[in-house]
Amino acid sequence: MKATFLYGAGDVRVETVPDPAIRFPTDAIVRTVRACVCGSDLHRYHSMPASTTPRSMGHELIAVVEEVGPEVTTVRPGDFVVAPFAWQDNTCAFCREGMQTACLHGGFYGTPEAAGLQAEFARIPQADGSLVVVPDVDPDAADESLLNSLLALSDVYLTGYHAAHMGRVGPGTTITVIGDGAVGLSAVLASRTLGAERIILMGRHRDRTDLGTDWGATEVVAE
């Protein structure tokens, strides 16, 4: 399969590597439908020292399940799924408190434990806790805008939503979002969805704050 690797600042290569295989009974193998670039990828793209040992890239994915380990019960081959940016069992004490990135049995992609997701196929550890099934959508027939929206659920929108959720945004609340980047705009959208009455967006880019207004910001404070 083809997969993406970072060898140093500005040095991204697409290389042929072996297809992933089930390593643990809780794993799943998925076929990538869409993957994307995150701001955290760009940090390394601009700063990583040159190395002969590359870093596999990517942690945002929508995909179709190809194979599951014998202990996987919540997904099956053929399911269309979203893979959030970290993998977790979703049953440990931390996961039950909503802190999945601190999962006792979880981790992050692009590490020795789990390769990056900018690849044609990927191994997903702890598949029962790490994959979310998208019902009633055929990715081969779905509209491009729907696929792009679903891809946002793998990381950037979740980050903004989590901020709003942890900030107890709800009906009638007043909130301020500082920053008009992708996460900030996602927080605006999430806050509107959660019922905030007044959403103040602070930003310095007119095109982005205009988008924030379209997405639910009631006021903009420009820098």
Indicate where each model-derived feature is located:
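Nucleotide donor/acceptor-binding cores
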Residues: 1, 26, 172-173, 197
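Short glycine/threonine/proline-enriched tight-turn/helix- or strand-capping micro-motif at secondary-structure
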Residues: 11-19
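Glycine-rich beta-strand-centered segment in the early N-terminal region that forms part
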Residues: 18-35, 48-93, 115, 135-140
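Cytochrome P450 core scaffold surrounding the K-helix E-X-X-R motif
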Residues: 40-45
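NAD(P)H dinucleotide-binding glycine-rich loop of Rossmann-like/cofactor-binding domains
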Residues: 91-178
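Adenosine-nucleotide cofactor-binding segment
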Residues: 174-180, 192-223
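N-terminal Rossmann-fold NAD(P) dinucleotide-binding loop
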Residues: 184-185
